[in-house]
């Protein structure tokens, strides 16, 4: 897609959660037709899409069939639990997979993206090792020093992750990783525990033609591997930002294609001596980047769609301090409702997005509060207050 093409275009989303919903809205504003695909009916992007399809996303034949039936101009993976081998086949047939089928395959496996970053590109990462049994995990963890972080090589949203304080916790960590892992392989990555001052996402935009662009860095807090709040712009020194941008450019150049990537880093070390450490990468809009709906002239979703379609991005501009705070469910329920919107939306410079998920479970992200402020502190306080006002009701 290196030359101008007529509109409307047809985009297929593989994964139709809250991030896919915002991609669909951004695409439709440009007159595009959107096909939303997911494993369950009523996924957030489906009500706003032109067509909805429900398939087993890890079933290669089902994935090939739905893509060939619609033959979209662009296929945009929005989740990690996909039949990636089928994407490679479809790409070979001429289907435009975003950013590339290889990028999707590499980044869904923590071992492959870590080997690329640390081994192939020489980026600074936490010290790490792999293990394929509890016994091997114990042997691999000890040289890293305690505590260590254990993660399945394939999982999402923090599933299966744990911090292990010493040898006595290895068996439980292995069991947790296997329970939270995706796929059939029994493999984990074990990392040294980094005592970091800040965790950031650098949204990186690769264009078909034109330079790689960067959004202002986003600070965020995670619990159990899942995003809880984010703010923009995060405060980094000029040198630190330059290092992060160089790392992000190196890894996204290697993965190729076009679109927006969420590249995560840790900032570690004594004040004034912090170093930037590569953590992970998603080849798609990032959950921490929901804050860009309040904090930028073009949100991460607008940027992704423009980059994918080869449209110009003249400027990425901050609109001032902005923050987000997630709205979580606390119980399991087949139906949900909400109260407290009046209280939440009374917070100045705030907005609330409810994702429209059809059911709830403890810890499931049901919405997000966004806010702007004169300062980052004020923006974060407003986002927190707005989120606290919304209550997820799981019974009538």
Language-model segment annotations:
Residues 106-201, 205-224, 228-251, 383, ...:
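Active-site nucleotide/adenylate-binding loops and adjacent lid/helix of ATP-dependent enzymes
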Residues 274-284:
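A short beta-strand motif that forms the metal-chelation/ATP-contact edge
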Residues 306-396:
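Peripheral (often C-terminal) accessory segments that flank ATP-dependent C-N-forming ligase machineries
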């Amino acid at each position: 897609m290196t030359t101008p093409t007529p509109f409307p275009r047809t985009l297929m989303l593989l994964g139709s959660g809250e991030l896919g919903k915002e991609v669909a809205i951004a695409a439709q504003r440009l007159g595009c037709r959107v096909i939303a695909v997911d494993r369950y009916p009523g996924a957030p992007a489906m009500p706003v899409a032109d067509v909805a399809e429900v398939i087993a996303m890890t079933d290669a034949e089902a994935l090939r069939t739905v893509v060939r039936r619609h033959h979209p101009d662009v296929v945009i993976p929005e989740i990690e639990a996909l039949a990636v081998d089928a994407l490679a086949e479809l790409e070979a047939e001429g289907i435009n997979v975003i950013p590339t089928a290889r990028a999707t395959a590499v980044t869904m496996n923590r071992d492959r993206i870590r080997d690329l970053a640390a081994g192939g590109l020489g980026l600074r990462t936490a010290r790490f090792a792999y293990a394929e049994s509890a016994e091997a995990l114990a042997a691999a963890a000890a040289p890293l020093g305690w505590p260590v972080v254990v993660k399945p090589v394939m999982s999402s949203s923090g599933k299966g992750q744990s911090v292990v304080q010493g040898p006595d916790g290895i068996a439980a960590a292995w069991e947790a990783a296997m329970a939270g892992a995706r796929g059939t392989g029994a493999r984990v990555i074990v990392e040294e525990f980094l005592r970091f001052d800040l965790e950031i996402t650098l949204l990186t935009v690769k264009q078909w033609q034109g330079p790689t662009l960067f959004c202002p860095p986003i600070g965020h807090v995670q619990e159990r591997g899942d995003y809880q709040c984010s703010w923009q712009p995060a405060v980094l020194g000029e040198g630190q930002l330059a290092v992060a941008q160089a790392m992000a450019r190196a890894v996204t150049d290697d993965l190729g294609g076009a679109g927006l990537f969420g590249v995560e880093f840790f900032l570690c070390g004594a004040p004034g001596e912090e170093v930037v450490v590569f953590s992970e990468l998603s080849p798609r809009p990032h959950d921490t980047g929901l804050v860009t709906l309040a904090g930028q002239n073009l949100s991460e979703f607008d940027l992704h769609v423009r980059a994918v379609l080869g449209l110009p991005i003249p400027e990425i501009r901050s609109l001032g301090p902005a923050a987000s705070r997630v709205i979580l469910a606390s119980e399991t329920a087949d139906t949900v409702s909400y109260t407290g919107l009046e209280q939440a939306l009374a917070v100045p410079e705030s907005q609330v997005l409810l994702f429209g998920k059809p059911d709830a479970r403890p810890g499931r992200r049901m919405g997000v509060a966004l806010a702007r402020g004169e300062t980052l502190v004020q923006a974060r306080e407003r986002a927190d207050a707005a989120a606290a006002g919304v209550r997820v009701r799981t019974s009538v």
